[in-house]
Structure formats: structure tokens, C-alpha cells
Curated annotation (Swiss-Prot):
Molecular-function GO term, any one: lipoate synthase activity
Native source species: Karelsulcia muelleri (strain GWSS)
Catalysed reactions, as listed in the record: [[Fe-S] cluster scaffold protein carrying a second [4Fe-4S](2+) cluster] + N(6)-octanoyl-L-lysyl-[protein] + 2 oxidized [2Fe-2S]-[ferredoxin] + 2 S-adenosyl-L-methionine + 4 H(+) = [[Fe-S] cluster scaffold protein] + N(6)-[(R)-dihydrolipoyl]-L-lysyl-[protein] + 4 Fe(3+) + 2 hydrogen sulfide + 2 5'-deoxyadenosine + 2 L-methionine + 2 reduced [2Fe-2S]-[ferredoxin]
Official protein name in the record: Lipoyl synthase
Intrachain disulfide bonds: none
Requisite cofactors: [4Fe-4S] cluster
Keywords: 4Fe-4S, Cytoplasm, Iron, Iron-sulfur, Metal-binding, S-adenosyl-L-methionine, Transferase
Length: 286
């Protein structure tokens, strides 16, 4: 894999000011040793989201069994399951005064249930402690197992999301252990068995063509996916898949308009957009 010598030379539209008004959530998450993808993923929108009372929590540890070339989460042998985690997450969301929580996780292919039971218990614990909180669950693919997907659906989060991440041609390179059609079918199945809002996300700048992006939008909409996010890929390190191109803002706007014309209920498209950006807005759509 080639190293991108220009990885540190980002265009001006990708530069953001250092966050300075999210101390409360930051301190609590550090004190309680909570895994937030906001921090571990170095999200550029961390201050904006946390100030709005929105945060993304990662369950089932911080070591993933998969080795996606775009992702900054550690790969290896995960730790043992913390069966108290659902209650811990729920309690801390309450004291943080979170209004809308996004729950995600590492892949746990080492477990028979791939972590689905902890997933279900976490959703239930959060809802039990605060009925008014809204939830988005950004789930792994569970290798397409419907019995495991059903566990999530049965707890009725407001939004269930699963990211396709990239176009079909690049999936094997970027998401080594994932499958493009499997990801599409996970979301398609959720829509077939429920009225829960579905969502996906893709990254640009990996070497995809315009035609491939548009086809991915079509594939997503054909699966009745309601919401899509489109953002610029930024390589976590020189060991990861390198950025082939920084996409200018007007191209993101173009894709936003195309996606809306296809019938998506909501589209977030821009260089700094990440999967959970403006997530709280997605529950108020008609």
C-alpha cells in the first residue's frame, strides 16, 4: 500500500477550530472510561455535537476483530464482555444530559452472537432510564444473520444505521471482511420487517468515480434506505488506506441534490460530514 505524502496537507475547507465548549461531556467520558467514537475517531464535529447534547458511544470494547483499511479503531483480540456495560452506558448518558445518543460498536466476530445480546440490553437500559431520549444504533453487519438483526429491531430504536462506506468496486480493498451486497441487504431486511428509519453512509476520496457514487446512491435507495451521509475520507495514519483525492464542497452539494431527487428523506453531504453528524435531526423527519 502506498503512503500518501500529502496526507497532512489538507485543503482549507477541512480545517476546523479546536473545540472549547464541551468540557462537561469530555470530563465525564474520561472519568468513567467510556469509549466514544467522537474521540477515538477524531471527529471534526465533536464540539458542535457535544454542545447540542449529542454523542456517539462505542460498546463491546475498543478492539475490533476486523481490519478495515479506512478505520482508526484498533484490531486484535478483544477483551472479555463487560456484562454491566449496558447499565453503565445508560447511567452515564443520563448524568451527561444527553438528548440524543448514537450507539455503535466494534465488530465482535469472536462471539457466537457477535455482540447482539449486549446491543439489545444496551438499548433497553437506555430507554428504561430515560424514555424521552432518542436513539440511533449504528450496527455492524452481523454477517447478515437475521436472528441477530432481529434483536436490534425488537428494541425499536428510532434509527438503525449501517454504513456501506464505499462503492462496490472498492469494498474489498477498503473493508476487507465486509461485503457490499450484505451491507445493503442488512438495511433492506430491517425495512422489510419494521417501520424503523434506516440510514447509511459513504466516504469520498478513495478513488471512486462519479458513476460509482451515483450507483451506490441508487442501490441504497432501492433498499428503501431513508437517510444517507456523504463525507470526505481522511486517513487515520500512513498505515491506512491513503486519500486519493480531496473532494471540493460543490461536488458534495451535487451529490446531495442527486440523492434528494432519488427520494431520500434526508441527506447530509459535505467534506466534514460524519455518520452521526446532525443525527438528532433525523428522528424528526416526516
Amino acid at each position: 500500500m502506498k503512503k500518501n505524502k500529502n496526507i497532512n496537507f489538507k485543503p482549507k475547507w477541512l480545517r476546523v477550530k479546536s473545540p472549547d465548549k464541551y468540557n462537561n461531556i469530555y470530563k465525564i467520558s474520561n472519568y468513567n472510561n467510556l469509549n466514544t467514537i467522537c474521540k477515538s475517531g477524531s471527529c471534526p464535529n465533536i464540539a458542535e455535537c457535544w454542545e447540542q447534547g449529542v454523542a456517539t458511544f462505542m460498546i463491546l470494547g475498543n478492539i475490533c476483530t476486523r481490519s478495515c483499511k479506512f478505520c482508526g479503531v484498533k484490531t486484535g483480540k478483544p477483551n472479555k464482555i463487560d456484562f454491566y456495560e449496558p447499565k453503565k452506558i445508560a447511567h452515564n448518558i443520563k448524568i451527561m444530559k444527553i438528548k440524543h445518543a448514537v450507539i455503535t460498536s466494534v465488530d465482535r466476530d469472536d462471539l457466537k452472537d457477535m455482540g447482539a445480546i449486549i446491543w439489545g440490553k444496551t438499548i433497553k437500559a437506555i430507554k428504561n432510564i430515560n424514555e424521552k431520549i432518542s436513539l440511533e444504533t449504528l450496527i455492524p453487519d452481523f454477517k447478515g444473520r437475521k436472528d441477530l438483526i432481529n434483536i436490534i429491531v425488537n428494541e425499536k430504536p428510532e434509527v438503525i444505521s449501517h454504513n456501506i462506506e464505499t462503492v462496490r468496486r472498492l469494498t474489498k480493498k477498503v473493508r476487507t471482511q465486509a461485503k457490499y451486497d450484505r451491507s445493503i441487504n442488512v438495511l433492506k431486511y430491517i425495512k422489510l420487517i419494521s417501520n424503523i428509519r434506516t440510514k447509511t453512509g459513504i466516504m469520498l476520496g478513495l478513488g471512486e468515480t462519479e458513476e460509482e457514487v451515483i450507483q451506490t446512491l441508487k442501490d441504497s435507495r432501492n433498499a428503501n434506505i431513508d437517510i444517507i451521509t456523504i463525507g470526505q475520507y481522511l486517513s487515520p495514519s500512513i498505515k491506512h488506506f491513503y486519500v486519493k483525492k480531496f473532494i471540493p464542497p460543490y461536488i458534495f452539494k451535487k451529490y446531495e441534490n442527486i440523492a434528494l431527487d432519488m427520494g431520500f428523506l434526508y441527506v447530509e453531504s459535505g467534506p466534514l460530514v460524519r455518520s452521526s453528524y446532525n443525527a438528532y435531526k433525523h428522528i424528526f423527519l416526516k
